Each structure stands twice: as C-alpha cells, then as structure tokens.
Regions:
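Alpha/beta-hydrolase
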Residues: 37-197
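Catalytic histidine-centered segment of alpha/beta-hydrolase-like enzymes
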Residues: 180-190, 217-229, 233
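Hydrophobic/aromatic beta-strand patches that form the interior of the parallel beta-sheet core
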Residues: 19, 153-155, 215
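Short catalytic/ligand-binding loop motif for oxyanion handling, primarily in non-cytosolic enzymes
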Residues: 2-4, 26-29, 161-164, 222-225
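A structural motif corresponding to the C-terminal end of an alpha-helix
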Residues: 144-148, 201-214
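C-terminal alpha-helix
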Residues: 235-242
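Core-facing hydrophobic residues within beta-strands of well-ordered domains
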Residues: 15-16, 211-212, 220
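Conserved hydrolase catalytic core segment
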Residues: 1-38
Length: 242
C-alpha cells in the first residue's frame, strides 16, 4: 500500500487504475493523530520507526521455523489472517521461508532508532526499512491532489489488526493494553485512526475530481486476497472491466 500510494503521487500519468489492498495510512505508521494526520512533532514522536520486538528479531536471526509465539510462523499467522482461519501448511511454509530471507540490522530490518526517556521510549531513526514508514518520511497525503485521476479500489478486511483504527502494532494501543508501560492517556496520545485517515484522503481525492470505492471483506484480516480469494478476484475483474 505504501509503495502504491507513493508511485501514484510520483507518476499519476502512468496509472489507469489503482488498487489498494489493506494499505498503510497515507500519513505513515504511527506518530500522527486525527483523520487529518497531524504529527505530534517533527521527530516522529509516537512512531516506532526502526524498533521491533527483540524476541521476534532473535527468532528471525535464528531462522526459527517452529511454533514459538515470537517465531515467524506465529507472527505471520497473527498479523495476516483472521483468528481461526485455516492456513494451508504449504502456503504457510512458503511465507515463512520468504520472511526468513530478510536481512537484519540497522541498515535493513528493522533499522535504527533513538532511545527516549519517556513513553513510548523510542523515536524513529534515519536508516532501515521500518523507518521508511515513519510520518516524517512516509506522508503521501498529496495523493488527494494528483491529476489525472485514476479510479481507486480500496479493499480492506474487517478483522485486520495490523492496519486498523485500533492496530495492535500502534504504540498507543499497546499502551492502553498495558503492554508498553507509562501510557499518558488517550487525550495526550490517542490511537492512530489508520482507516479513517485513508478514507479522509480518498474523500479529498473525490472532491478534487477522482473516484474511489471502499470494499470491506467481513471475514478477512490483512490478507483478503488469500482469505477470500474468489470474491477478491471477482471484485478485481469487475473493477478493471468497469
């Protein structure tokens, strides 16, 4: 999603259609509040940036293909699929194999970060994959002003916990749940309304002459194309044909 947003902003004339599948907010991941995507400060405060769970990083480094809760298999299943969805073992093995090819470190995944004395204890850095999602680097809300205006199909899963208005990867949500201590409260640091921010930018796009459709797959989480493949293909065909 983040790549598609950016490509559309940079090269709108090359697009005939744009399909956004469970896209990242056009204001980046973390570090903003409200549907207008206001940053807390220029440092990207509130965004995890290049920080990742140390236990997950350890399991990646060990090439762990097992069932440990912090190993690639379990993390992929929790992040991509709705609870209880029957994951095909062969496909799951393929996803795990591909994830374990990732390069680790400050120049790769997750990147570097700056420690912080107060909540949320980290600030985004300047290197690596995850920092590319921080709001000071990833703001593509200019999409609302692109011209020409390719039609947009936005597909999201109703059970998505990765890109959501209550994302389990949002430091504010983790603070509310007590996973990250010292949460200052919802008034000071509310969860990022990722879905609301996407809709707000697409509504601006519509006001500027574009058009979009929002489709919610009720039985899907982050991977609607895998969880409801028949409907997904039908919707794509109809969108391209229309």
């Amino acid at each position: 999603g983040g790549v598609a947003w950016r490509y559309a902003v940079n090269h709108p004339e090359r697009l005939t259609h744009l399909i956004l599948l469970s896209p990242m907010s056009p204001y980046g991941f973390g570090g903003t509040r409200g549907e207008e995507g206001r940053m807390y400060d220029e440092r990207g405060w509130g965004s995890p940036g290049g920080f990742a769970n140390p236990a997950f990083l350890q399991k990646l480094g060990e090439q762990d293909r097992g069932d440990d809760p912090m190993a690639a298999r379990a993390v992929l299943e929790k992040s991509l699929f709705a609870a209880g969805w029957p994951v095909d073992k062969a496909w799951q093995d393929l996803y795990v194999d591909e994830l374990l090819k990732i390069h680790l470190g400050e120049d790769y995944y997750p990147g570097d970060y700056q420690p912080l004395a107060e909540f949320p204890y980290v600030l985004p850095g300047t290197r690596g994959i995850s920092n590319a999602l921080a709001p000071q680097y990833a703001n593509v809300s200019a999409f609302a002003q692109i011209n020409p205006h390719p039609p947009v199909l936005w597909i999201r899963g109703a059970k998505d916990t990765l890109v959501s208005d209550q994302s389990y990867s949002d430091l504010a949500v983790l603070g509310q749940l007590g996973v990250v201590p010292g949460y200052p409260g919802a008034e000071a640091f509310p969860p990022q309304p990722m879905v609301g921010q996407t809709r707000a930018v697409l509504e601006q796009y519509k006001e500027n002459g574009g058009r979009y459709s929002e489709l919610v797959f009720e039985h899907s989480a982050h991977a609607s194309h895998l969880e409801e493949p028949e409907r997904f293909v039908d919707e794509l065909k109809a969108f391209i044909a229309g």
